[in-house]
């Protein structure tokens, strides 16, 4: 998941701005006389001086990952900005973020009570919930248990180590055939268009136990809903920062609510079908696994939290949304990097050919045989940093970090992009170099270096689907490299400039792909 509340410049109409200005001017004039009392021995947070009403939005601009990184060079790893009327603490630097999210995890594991969060999964989202213990904590335990159970389910044939691998492998074959067909018909393909549908099918298989044709209207509707969610959420919601705007008509907010309601309706229907056909002795997918783990509506004998059907819908919704957008964006960027660095693409192919072969698809058990591919994925995560921020955190109580006082209920941004491009952490961070993650002899991945990359957050709010996402990216990419060779279009320059949003995606483009011969030398 990524930061969904910056930037919002340009998303406020003139009428909204005028009403907000009138309504909050008095509030601002009153509040500016009140300053948070700093406990003895602690310092006040540094940061740029905010303007009335709008705060620091002009300085943040349309590329917050870059502007906030630049601010960290001036103010340090812990500083404060103001978005609208809301103070926001920005954390940068690997050690500072690790201190906050792991060593002081209980103090920074909250979520801010942003207005838009209440409409995601009807306010029952694991990822966006302000409840860090209680029901939310119980739901996270349930989700982890269900994911573990699903990931160990046997495939339908001995060829696959688990059902997850079977879903990824079969859909990978379908994607290869689809791209081959499109290339023969059109001579080029849009990588994001086809990858996103393929990934959606894998997630549908894992969550719902069903696969759709690539042109199926239900599947395309899901893809479009996810895309619309990213566009609307990525543009930000001013009502999250200027409270009076919550009570004013907003076409953007109305669309956001409709998107979430439509997706919830879709998931509720499928969960209802699963309840009607549930068989404890035949667990078909993650939804079945969730139902199995809470048939009695309790997680365990010592837990008094009742687990409703709505909570299961919320968990499935979260798993689908997070896994779908993250994996599809990662694989789409992967293809772009393969085209941008043809020598690296060829080296990856040779590694797979030499250590796995070309007569079968790469399996999860082959990962240790292809360390350069693993290093490529890590460098992809680091260099693209397509998840520039985690979902915003919130201080659960009055606390301090690096000697600075942070009041309770302060919104906290975690700048993953800065960590992944920090010159104090990485040699020549702007260059794309998978070898930085290999051991001296190049035969294995340097785990210590790999752990520096930040993409799924860390601590108590770390992405619950991280393991499945990493496996899916590895398997999907391995199949693509083994079977296809990717090229840029003749006469066209490849544009690797990311577009800021919920996740940072590359600009839509067309590429070429040719099938590799099974006996290729």
UniProtKB/Swiss-Prot annotation:
Keywords: Endoplasmic reticulum, Heme, Iron, Membrane, Metal-binding, Microsome, Monooxygenase, Oxidoreductase. SUPFAM superfamilies: Cytochrome P450 (SSF48264). It catalyses: an organic molecule + reduced [NADPH--hemoprotein reductase] + O2 = an alcohol + oxidized [NADPH--hemoprotein reductase] + H2O + H(+). InterPro entries: Cyt_P450, Cyt_P450_CS, Cyt_P450_E_grp-I, Cyt_P450_E_grp-I_CYP1, Cyt_P450_sf. It is found in: Endoplasmic reticulum membrane; Microsome membrane. Pfam families: p450. Its EC number is 1.14.14.1. One of its GO terms (biological process) is progesterone metabolic process. Transmembrane segments: none annotated. The keyword Iron applies. One of its GO terms (molecular function) is heme binding. Heme binds at residue 463. Its main location: endoplasmic reticulum. CDD domains: CYP1A. Substrate binds at residue 229. Its cofactor is heme. It is a peripheral membrane protein. One of its GO terms (cellular component) is endoplasmic reticulum membrane. Belongs to the cytochrome P450 family. Cytochromes P450 are a group of heme-thiolate monooxygenases. They oxidize a variety of structurally unrelated compounds, including steroids, fatty acids, and xenobiotics. This is Cytochrome P450 1A1. It comes from Chaetodon capistratus. The lineage of its organism: Eukaryota, Metazoa, Chordata, Craniata, Vertebrata.
């Amino acid at each position: 998941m990524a930061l969904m509340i910056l930037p919002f410049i340009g998303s406020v109409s003139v009428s909204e701005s005028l009403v907000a200005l009138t309504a909050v001017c008095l509030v601002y004039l009153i509040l500016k006389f009140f300053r948070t009392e700093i406990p003895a021995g602690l310092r006040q947070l540094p940061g740029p001086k905010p303007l009335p009403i709008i705060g620091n939005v002009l300085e943040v601009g349309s590329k917050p990952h870059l502007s906030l990184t630049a601010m960290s060079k001036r103010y340090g790893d812990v500083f404060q900005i103001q978005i609208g009327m809301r103070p926001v603490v920005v954390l940068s630097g690997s050690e500072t973020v690790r201190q906050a999210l792991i060593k002081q995890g209980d103090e920074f594991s909250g979520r801010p009570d942003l207005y838009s969060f209440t409409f995601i999964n009807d306010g029952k989202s694991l990822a966006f919930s302000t409840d860090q213990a209680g029901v939310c904590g119980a739901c996270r335990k349930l989700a982890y248990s269900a994911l573990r159970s699903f990931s160990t389910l046997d495939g339908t044939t001995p060829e696959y180590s688990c059902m997850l691998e079977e879903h990824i492998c079969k859909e990978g074959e379908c994607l290869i055939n689809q791209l081959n067909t499109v290339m023969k018909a059109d001579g080029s393909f849009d990588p994001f268009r086809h990858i996103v549908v393929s990934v959606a099918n894998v997630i549908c298989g894992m969550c719902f136990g069903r696969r759709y044709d690539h042109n199926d209207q239900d599947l395309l509707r899901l893809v479009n809903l996810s895309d619309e969610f990213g566009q609307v959420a990525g543009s930000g919601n001013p009502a999250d920062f200027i409270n009076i705007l919550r009570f004013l008509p907003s076409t953007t907010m109305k669309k956001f609510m409709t998107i979430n309601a439509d997706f919830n309706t879709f998931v509720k229907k499928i969960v209802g079908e699963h309840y009607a056909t549930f068989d404890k002795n035949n667990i078909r997918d993650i939804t079945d696994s969730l139902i199995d783990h809470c048939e009695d509506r309790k997680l365990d004998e010592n837990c008094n939290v009742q687990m409703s059907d709505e909570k299961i819908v919320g968990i499935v919704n979260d798993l689908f949304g997070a896994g779908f957008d993250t994996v599809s964006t990662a694989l789409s960027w992967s293809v772009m990097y393969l085209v941008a660095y043809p020598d690296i693409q060829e080296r990856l192919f040779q590694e797979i050919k030499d250590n796995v072969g070309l007569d079968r698809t790469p399996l999860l058990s082959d990962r240790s045989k292809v360390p350069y591919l693993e290093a490529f994925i890590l460098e992809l995560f680091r260099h693209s940093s397509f998840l520039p921020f985690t979902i915003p955190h919130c201080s659960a109580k009055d606390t301090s970090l690096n000697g600075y006082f942070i009041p309770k209920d302060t919104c906290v941004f975690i700048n993953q992009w800065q960590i992944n491009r920090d010159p104090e952490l990485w040699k020549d961070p702007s260059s794309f170099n998978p070898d930085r993650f290999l051991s001296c002899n190049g035969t294995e991945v340097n785990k210590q270096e790999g752990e520096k990359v930040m993409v799924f957050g860390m601590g108590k709010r770390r992405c619950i689907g991280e393991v499945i996402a990493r496996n899916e990216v590895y398997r999907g990419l391995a199949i693509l490299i083994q079977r296809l060779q990717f090229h840029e279009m003749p006469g066209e320059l490849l544009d690797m400039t990311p577009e800021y949003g919920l996740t940072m995606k590359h600009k839509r483009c067309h590429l070429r792909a040719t099938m590799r011969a099974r006996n290729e030398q």
